[in-house]
């Protein structure tokens, strides 16, 4: 990926009111995107958002910019990111735009684009939009200005799509499920999907007020969900993040089930049903227990760089259909084109129902290795700690001791002057000691 001024790996994101998340920038972004996308023929754009209060301001700015370029916008209202990808495909729109900062606090927001097929925009299109941003805004003739409209029952359309990914011969009758929607975009979607499939549903995190998205709820903070599952004696809990592209689950004992375990369950069930094509893709941070559990099943496993974009790229490279991050991004290309928390959760529920097993028991075939992460701050410009001979020597010694029953990963943060030291193995005390030993070597540089 070439150097970008605005676009990162997941669109454009920042604090509202600070560049680039300002009304004037977003208006120009809408215009620039409109100018580029208009070259492809269709002049229809789908715009969705999560529940942040700033979404109203930003969607108005986007719509004005698109209209000035001659493109019409159809609004979904609050809608999960994967729903916008789905609606973009079904409406044959030229692009879908999501206004969201995913799992971030309410004071952040962002803009990301989907192409006509529901995947992220190609690099060359993003680069063309950035080039257009350098030009002065012009307006098409009045007769060619874009219009704005609202999609009738966008939520209902997506609810039916989600239900369609659950096997027709199964139902959720008899299951008690707590669902936490993070006061985000799935608040009016996920509870209805589960209820219509037969589950008894207790919903939390379903009262968005514009400023409480992801606040002590959702996939990044499952404590409220764990407590409610235990209090209600529920069969399981499902936590989604603010824009619905992540899922973390909780079993009936209150234990957290992360993206690695979710992918293990889905991949194993796919193998049992004869529907698994190829292997599974994780990331550099995926637990070694996942890799070993899949190996025991004969399922190939590959690691991508951290980020759902890179997981998708690796899937496309391999021709495989399932990938995930331990943070809860689960990509099921047989079902969707992007990470979808509701759809991934439904596949786990299907495995529970089909096998008459609890979530706890479905996870029992995978032993999670203790994984210790230590962040070490370093002075930028003082040399690369990863190239230091002392650091290399300590790391090599730890790797030799762990052998094939553990793993060491050192990487730089992409946003701060930090070295992230990750060590995993079978013995937590040993792993912790090794992580701090390597961290001390990094600090000494």
From Swiss-Prot:
HAMAP family, alphabetized = GlmM_B
In its record, the post-translational modification comment is:
Activated by phosphorylation.
Query: Per UniProt, where does Mg(2+) bind?
Result: 102, 241, 243, 245
Per the entry, the cofactor note is: Binds 1 Mg(2+) ion per subunit.
Phosphoserine found at: 102
Q: Which cysteines are joined by disulfide bonds?
A: none
| Entry's Gene Ontology cellular component terms | cytosol
Cofactor(s) of this protein? Mg(2+)
Q: Which SUPFAM superfamilies match?
A: Phosphoglucomutase, C-terminal domain, Phosphoglucomutase, first 3 domains
Name of one Pfam family that matches: PGM_PMM_IV
Q: Where is the active site?
A: 102
Q: Which organism is it from?
A: Salmonella arizonae (strain ATCC BAA-731 / CDC346-86 / RSK2980)
* E.C. no: 5.4.2.10
Give a yes or no for keyword Transferase in this entry: no
Name the family.
Answer: Belongs to the phosphohexose mutase family.
Q: What is this protein called?
A: Phosphoglucosamine mutase
Output the superkingdom of the source species: Bacteria
UniProt entry tagged with the keyword Nucleus: no
Reaction(s) catalysed (UniProt annotation): alpha-D-glucosamine 1-phosphate = D-glucosamine 6-phosphate
Gene Ontology BP term (one): carbohydrate metabolic process
Q: What are the record keywords, sorted?
A: Isomerase, Magnesium, Metal-binding, Phosphoprotein
The role this protein plays is: Catalyzes the conversion of glucosamine-6-phosphate to glucosamine-1-phosphate.
Name of the gene encoding the protein in the UniProt record: glmM
Q: Which InterPro entries match?
A: A-D-PHexomutase_a/b/a-I, A-D-PHexomutase_a/b/a-I/II/III, A-D-PHexomutase_a/b/a-II, A-D-PHexomutase_a/b/a-III, A-D-PHexomutase_C, A-D-PHexomutase_C_sf, A-D-PHexomutase_CS, Alpha-D-phosphohexomutase_SF
Q: Which GO terms describe its molecular function?
A: magnesium ion binding; phosphoglucosamine mutase activity; phosphomannomutase activity
């Amino acid at each position: 990926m070439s150097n970008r001024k605005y676009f990162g790996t997941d669109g454009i994101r920042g604090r509202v009111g600070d560049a680039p998340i300002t009304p004037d920038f977003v208006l120009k972004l809408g215009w620039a995107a409109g100018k580029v996308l208009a070259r492809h023929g269709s002049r229809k754009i789908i715009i969705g958002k999560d529940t942040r209060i700033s979404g109203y301001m930003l969607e108005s700015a986007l719509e004005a910019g698109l209209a000035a370029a001659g493109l019409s916008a159809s609004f979904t209202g609050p809608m999960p990111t994967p729903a916008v990808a789905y609606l973009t495909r079904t409406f044959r729109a030229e692009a879908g735009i999501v206004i969201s900062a995913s799992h971030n606090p309410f004071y952040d927001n962002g803009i990301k684009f989907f192409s006509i097929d529901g995947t992220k925009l190609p690099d060359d299109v993003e680069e063309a939009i950035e080039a257009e941003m350098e030009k002065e805004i012009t307006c098409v003739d009045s007769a060619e200005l874009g219009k704005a409209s609202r999609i009738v029952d966008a939520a209902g359309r997506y609810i039916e799509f989600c239900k369609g990914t659950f096997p027709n011969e199964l139902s959720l009758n008899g299951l008690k499920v707590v669902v936490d929607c993070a006061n985000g975009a799935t608040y009016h979607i996920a509870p209805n999907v589960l209820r219509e499939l037969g589950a008894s549903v207790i919903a939390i995190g379903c009262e968005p007020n514009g400023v409480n998205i992801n606040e002590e709820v959702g996939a990044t903070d499952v404590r409220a969900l764990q407590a409610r599952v235990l209090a209600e004696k529920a069969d399981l809990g499902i936590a989604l993040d603010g824009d619905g592209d992540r899922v973390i689950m909780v079993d009936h004992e209150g234990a957290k089930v992360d993206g690695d375990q979710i992918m293990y369950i889905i991949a194993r069930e796919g193998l049992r049903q004869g529907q698994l094509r190829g292997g599974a893709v994780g990331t550099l941070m995926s637990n070694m227990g996942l890799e070993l559990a899949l190996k025991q099943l004969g399922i190939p496993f590959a690691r991508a760089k951290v980020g759902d974009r890179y997981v998708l790229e690796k899937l496309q490279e391999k021709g495989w259909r399932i990938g995930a991050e331990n943070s809860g991004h689960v990509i099921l290309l047989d079902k969707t084109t992007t990470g979808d928390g509701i759809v991934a959760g439904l596949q786990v529920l299907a495995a529970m129902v089909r096998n008459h097993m609890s979530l706890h028991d479905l996870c029992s075939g995978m032993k999670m290795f203790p994984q210790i992460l230590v962040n070490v701050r370093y002075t930028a410009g003082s040399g690369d700690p990863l190239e230091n001979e002392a650091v290399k020597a300590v790391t090599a010694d730890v790797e030799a001791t762990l052998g094939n029953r553990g793993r060491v990963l050192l990487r730089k943060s992409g946003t701060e002057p930090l070295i992230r030291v990750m060590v995993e193995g079978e013995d937590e005390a040993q792993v912790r000691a090794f992580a701090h030993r390597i961290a001390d070597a990094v600090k000494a540089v």
